[in-house]
Amino acid sequence: MNQRLQRLADQIQRELAVLIRDAVNDPRLTGFVTISSVKVSPDLGYADVYVTIMEPELNDAMTMSNHEESIKVLNKAAGFLRTELSHSLKTRTTPRLRFHYDEVTARGNYMMDLISKAVIKTEENESDEQENEE
């Protein structure tokens, strides 16, 4: 991606984060929406927006159906968001927005949880071995 497209993608990411937080008031959109990246097509026709969604309660695990529902809500609001985005962008055309759930971030969080559990288990085993030696 060239520098101009990257700057535009960064601006879209910043503006959309504010718009989703402040302007989208759909009750089906539960959780905290984070825009992890934006990729703009070379002809500025489309912008693929990758989002992660975290539940407001730490103990609540979002199921895949919750993610799909949230993505549907965002895609339904894409026209409104595009219109609002056009007021702040200094381009002739505003890209059409396509929202996708960011699997990479979710898998990374899952792997970090697995690593943390493994480290805790290793530390417990080492402390048990030290107690047995004494």
From Swiss-Prot:
This protein's GO CC annotations: cytosol
Top-level taxon of origin: Bacteria
One GO MF term: ribosomal small subunit binding
Annotated keywords: Cytoplasm, Ribosome biogenesis
GO biological process, alphabetically ordered: maturation of SSU-rRNA
Pfam families with a match to the protein in the record: RBFA
Subcellular location: Cytoplasm
UniProt function note: One of several proteins that assist in the late maturation steps of the functional core of the 30S ribosomal subunit. Associates with free 30S ribosomal subunits (but not with 30S subunits that are part of 70S ribosomes or polysomes). Required for efficient processing of 16S rRNA. May interact with the 5'-terminal helix region of 16S rRNA.
Subunit structure: Monomer. Binds 30S ribosomal subunits, but not 50S ribosomal subunits or 70S ribosomes.
Family to which this protein belongs: Belongs to the RbfA family.
NCBIfam families: PRK13816.1, rbfA
Protein name: Ribosome-binding factor A
Gene name tied to this protein: rbfA
